[in-house]
Amino acid sequence: MELNTLKSTFINNFGKEPNSLFFSPGRINLIGEHIDYNGGFVFPCPITLGTFAAASLRDDRICRAYSLNFESLGVIEFSLDDLSYKKEDNWTNYLKGVLKVLIEKGYKIDKGIDLVINGNLPNGAGLSSSASLEMLIVKILDTFFSLNISKVDAALIGKEVENTYIGVNSGIMDQFAISLGEKDKAILLDCNSLYYEYVPLNLGDNSIIIMNTNKRRELADSKYNERRKECDDSLDTLKKYTNISSLCELTSLEFETYKDKIEDSNKLRRCVHAISENERVKDAVKALKENNLELFGQLMNQSHISLRDDYEVTGKELDTLAENAWKQPGVLGARMTGAGFGGCAIAIVNNAHVDEFIKNVGQAYKDAIGYEASFYVASIGNGPTEL
């Protein structure tokens, strides 16, 4: 259905059939939260929700773009000769940013495109709708102009667009998880070295349920910066006593030796989270390789508790979802995912219990919070593809 709407919208706006259809996923992080900047591992995977596109190559230097998610904006038009950021160009700044970065890197792009997109990722929910769009655009341009961009380079290009063009200080995880995504696999990634490893994620009779608090992450940025500073300060203190360059180089056992050097109790708890979370990621990967989904679920639960009690980034909404999820039959594990303070939580739920799970957790959330959460059943999909 979505593809038919996409095609008909393309024909209505541009008077012809599109050359090609494309899809780019969103992502979740299964475990390994708030440790990418502490030298730790993240463990994301692409999901079957994402951004769809219909696109055609033009024979001039004009780009025309229309989004079914922002219909009131109509068709936004610009030329390859002016790729400067303009606030009024809204979401198409991502298209302009990717074009600008690619052209500056010497890729030959000499014609414009017509583009219609439609995403089914909720905006502002922490499922990486912007990285999904960036990787979609790279895929389209790579296909149309035969640019031969590697998957790792595609991720780095997306990060550069975010950092230098859009002006968001994001890391590499989102673009990497999407660009290198493979069906039924998660990616163990060290964001500093870009070392990565695919880990098969066979969920058997279970699905991933994404639970959206429907609370925008308005606190996330200020608290995120605060947490980073607390970790950086702690690292500076520990460096006086041990030769490390990041918190996650320490094991919990090693940290026991030095923890009395951190006098501030808040900073101490931040360290405890970072170091224990990195160990949980390694344990989670081992559990999956041994097909031990039960242990994997328990580690997810422990991760949420650590983020709630030691890192203090969950908040009432995410806690309500996770804590009610734990009580339901057929649940292997549940935790917040992303930056916290709103956004989404995830649960791994037996397929026979999914409907009951959504009904029970949804009702408990509405009773406690006063408005509804949204639920999405997702599986682990491929990276950006031409359909």
UniProtKB/Swiss-Prot annotation:
Enzyme class: transferase
Binding site for substrate: 33-36, 224
Role description: Catalyzes the transfer of the gamma-phosphate of ATP to D-galactose to form alpha-D-galactose-1-phosphate (Gal-1-P).
Protein name as it appears in the record: Galactokinase
Family the UniProt entry places it in: Belongs to the GHMP kinase family. GalK subfamily.
HAMAP family according to UniProt: Galactokinase
Gene3D superfamilies in the record: 3.30.230.10, GHMP kinase, C-terminal domain
Pfam families attached to this UniProt entry: GalKase_gal_bdg (PF10509), GHMP_kinases_C (PF08544), GHMP_kinases_N (PF00288)
GO molecular function, one term: ATP binding
Compartments reported by the entry: Cytoplasm
GO cellular component: cytosol
Residues annotated to bind ATP: 67, 124-130
EC number assigned by the record: 2.7.1.6
Primary location: cytoplasm
UniProt keywords, alphabetically: ATP-binding, Carbohydrate metabolism, Cytoplasm, Galactose metabolism, Kinase, Magnesium, Metal-binding, Nucleotide-binding, Transferase
Gene: galK
Catalytic activity reported: alpha-D-galactose + ATP = alpha-D-galactose 1-phosphate + ADP + H(+)
Pathway entry: Carbohydrate metabolism; galactose metabolism
UniProt-annotated binding residues for Mg(2+): 130, 162
